[in-house]
Amino acid sequence: CVNGIARQIQTRFLKETNNAEGTDGVHLFSHTYGCSQLGDDHINTRTMLQNMVRHPNAGAVLVIGLGCENNQVDAFRDTLGEFDPERVHFMVCQHQDDEVEAGVEQLHQLYEVMRHDKREPGKLSELKFGLECGGSDGLSGITANPMLGRFSDYVIANGGTTVLTEVPEMFGAERILMSHCRDEETFEKTVTMVNDFKQYFIAHNQPIYENPSDRKSTRLNSSH
């Protein structure tokens, strides 16, 4: 319910600041969750939003709540962990006489704090990259996957991290990952991880090697 209000705040602020001059932009991350969610669903939504607040590329953040959602702003703040109060603000719309005016004012305060931030060189060893399956097509095994494989080799060789998920899609091509393990302990962990997933499939009477298509198996086998 608060998405429309947040969009009004964003639009007005951008108009008043010449599109937030001197920054990479002001982005609105709206979503349809927060109300009527319980248990793990609620925790997952809150955790995802909190991770976005703490993201190192976020110069400043305004967290907006309507006031009646399950994902209460006070609980969100209390479970957020450490944060810079000059760069992370919170607003409950039902506590404001004019929520748009109050939100725009908060954005101006945040803007003054972060508008002069400058990029500085960093170390590759400080970065973590998540690899996402973009869907299989005719070029996956020719360009995309080999490129990500070489990219991962380069990042890891320089102390960085890449994260590869979707273990069942490794079936039939797991030996490629195993050949990249840095030591016997890592190799054994990889074997255990893959075999545990295979046993899970078997326990539920599911075929193991039919998960990746022939095309995907070929694509995986040609990647690094």
What does each model-found stretch correspond to?
Residues 1-222:
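Metallocofactor- and cofactor-centric catalytic cores in central/energy metabolism, strongly enriched
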